[in-house]
Amino acid sequence: MGKFQVLDHPLIQHKLTIIRNKDCGTRSFREVVNEISTLMAYEVSRDMPLQDKTIETPVAKMTAKELAGKKVAIVPILRAGIGMVDGILELIPAAKVGHIGMYRDEETLQPHEYFVKLPSDIGQRQVFVVDPMLATGGSAIMAIDALKKRGASNIKFVCLVSAPEGVKALREKHPDIDIYTAALDDRLNEDGYIVPGLGDAGDRLFGTK
């Protein structure tokens, strides 16, 4: 069973409070989501494999450590997931970036896939699937289905806010996936929004309604 981890670092929690506030404007929301994503990436990447490398410092030769093999692929679920990409790239600038496009039917709350574009070597990379919200879990499940179908196996799901319903659904469908979130909230409301949540992350990131 993959692990479920709430990242409770004080800076993450402080910044999460900023973006939860309904008075947080688009510019601030976007900037702080970027900052939270960088902080979360530090913990999510903790188990990346290392290998020895012989180098020479100004003083002496030594055996140092470097990342081993293929590195990370970041795969945002469009459109809100885009807001988390740059923050992770600041920490892992060599990462490749794929995209999976989803939209949610407002009546059924079911996700529909409309676009998939991934690095050709996705099966050799550690994949961070990013989406600010894990609500019903439908989009996350479908995105991970698409990744596994194309050969990915080392997958982590990273979100800012999650609902118990979404966590349960994702763990039941993909029990091998590690889930990282900045907060586990109370529940979903009748419209499929996380309560207390932070509203529609995509609209708040891009200034749309």
From Swiss-Prot:
InterPro entries: PRibTrfase_dom, PRTase-like, Upp_B, UPRTase/APRTase, Ura_phspho_trans. The keyword Glycosyltransferase applies. This is Uracil phosphoribosyltransferase. Pathway: Pyrimidine metabolism; UMP biosynthesis via salvage pathway; UMP from uracil: step 1/1. CDD domains: PRTases_typeI. Catalyzes the conversion of uracil and 5-phospho-alpha-D-ribose 1-diphosphate (PRPP) to UMP and diphosphate. One of its GO terms (molecular function) is uracil phosphoribosyltransferase activity. It catalyses: UMP + diphosphate = 5-phospho-alpha-D-ribose 1-diphosphate + uracil. Binds 1 Mg(2+) ion per subunit. The magnesium is bound as Mg-PRPP. Belongs to the UPRTase family. Keywords: Allosteric enzyme, Glycosyltransferase, GTP-binding, Magnesium, Nucleotide-binding, Transferase.
